[in-house]
Swiss-Prot record:
UniProt-annotated binding residues for (2S)-2-hydroxy-3-oxobutyl phosphate: 90-91, 132
Molecular function terms from GO: 6,7-dimethyl-8-ribityllumazine synthase activity
UniProt key word Cytoplasm: no
Family according to the record: Belongs to the DMRL synthase family.
Name of this protein: 6,7-dimethyl-8-ribityllumazine synthase
Binding site for 5-amino-6-(D-ribitylamino)uracil: 23, 61-63, 85-87, 118
Source organism per UniProt: Prochlorococcus marinus (strain MIT 9515)
GO BP annotations listed: riboflavin biosynthetic process
Pathway: Cofactor biosynthesis; riboflavin biosynthesis; riboflavin from 2-hydroxy-3-oxobutyl phosphate and 5-amino-6-(D-ribitylamino)uracil: step 1/2
Length: 158
């Protein structure tokens, strides 16, 4: 019996794309920072001249799937990370954005056979979002670890 697992030891052999929603950038900037810190500590070149990391900014979480799809058409990535923050308001807009963003990201991942980490915070309040973006824990770090694991796993399986 073969057992396959992703590795957490290094990201230096991965090509990573990050798509970040600008809406709620107080939150998304913090998540991106945590994500980049983790990737750097695991050996990925995160400098502005990096050839193994690309970052794309989009207006909001709804636009994450199309940007991810365009990135995957452009280049061979081992893994993508989508980052956003959608905070519940008084209308149903929250539900629509989350539903379409999550379905879109999943569909792009399936269509291109590339893992895309769904790093979109969905919270009921700004306080909850801030807690997840660094006050208590920066989930950006976790999303990067998931990317390292899935990127290496899929490389090993192929």
């Amino acid at each position: 019996m073969a057992i396959f697992e992703g590795s957490f030891t290094t990201a230096s052999n991965l090509k990573v794309g990050i798509v970040v929603a600008r809406f709620n950038d107080l939150i998304t900037n913090k998540i991106l920072s945590g994500c980049l810190d983790c990737l750097k500590r695991h050996g990925l070149d995160t400098s502005e001249t990096s050839e193994t990391l690309d970052i794309v900014w989009v207006p909001g979480s709804f636009e994450l799937p199309i940007a991810a799809k365009t990135l995957l058409k452009k280049s061979n990535y081992d893994v993508l990370i989508s980052l956003g923050a959608v905070i519940r308001g008084e209308t149903s807009h929250y539900d629509v954005v989350i539903s379409e963003a999550s379905k879109g990201i999943a569909q792009v991942s399936y269509d291109y056979d590339v893992p895309i980490i769904f790093g979109v915070l969905t919270t009921d309040s700004m306080q909850q979002a801030l807690e997840r973006a660094g006050i208590k824990n920066n989930l950006g770090w976790n999303y990067a670890l998931q990317a390292i694991e899935m990127g290496s796993l899929i490389k090993n399986l192929n």
